Amino acid sequence: MIPVDMAAEIGTAINMGRKITGPTRVVAPPKDFPSGEVLGDKIEKWAVGITIAPRKEQTYNITVDSFLDAGWDSIHLFCEPKVIVADKHSYLPITRRKKKHGAWANWLASLKDLIDIYPDADCYGLIQDDVIFCKGLREFMEQTLWPSGDTGICSVFVPSHYTRNNPGWHKTNRGFKLWMAQTFFFTPESARSCANYEFCKNWNKQKQIDNVVGRWANETKQYPYYFSPSLAQHIGDTSTIWSEGNRAAGKRAASDFVGE
């Protein structure tokens, strides 16, 4: 859960900035100083999906439960073949792929589907099936998005080597070297830009969602912002695309997750 003292500190920093609804010239903040502004209107319509693939140890149930406990009332399930949806989640909107897409193709197709199904959303989010979230996250994000006029993506999960000392949204532009696509939330304009970007549409490998999106963000100047401390944690022990053992460790895990 988001600590009260941290929320107050971040809220103070945000209230020091101006709320802007139109385009604005953005000056990059110092490396370890977070954005102190909230741009645009409050998010009221969310369109969030989760990409789900078969695993030896299925974690998607944990992720969906944690996401709903964090304040949302729905999430769209995008399921690869052979995924078994729990009875308790059968009421949620589900898109089942007729044939195996693979990680990247399912991710990009899911982003396009979200835009088509929920065309008037204020925020588009895609999360992966091996994450947990802190409680109160939805309300917190509605109070703090978007952190800058050049925001393309916001991630509430922060890999350990992206951790910053000062709490808040930090610009984290790494181009094709961007790490971890567990919790990407897009502005409506950025979601459409990413879904239709030629490099993204032409990427034909199964892996590297984070790298591809990072390159799009860098080339279009719609940058990633990662929140410190991490408001989500990577929990997956088995990967559907990587051969090594526990992905959710070291740099692939948050070192400062605030807890559920």
Spans of model-derived segments:
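An acidic/histidine-cluster motif and surrounding catalytic segment
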Residues: 10-13, 17, 22-127, 131-260
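Extreme N-terminal basic, low-complexity initiation segments
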Residues: 4-6
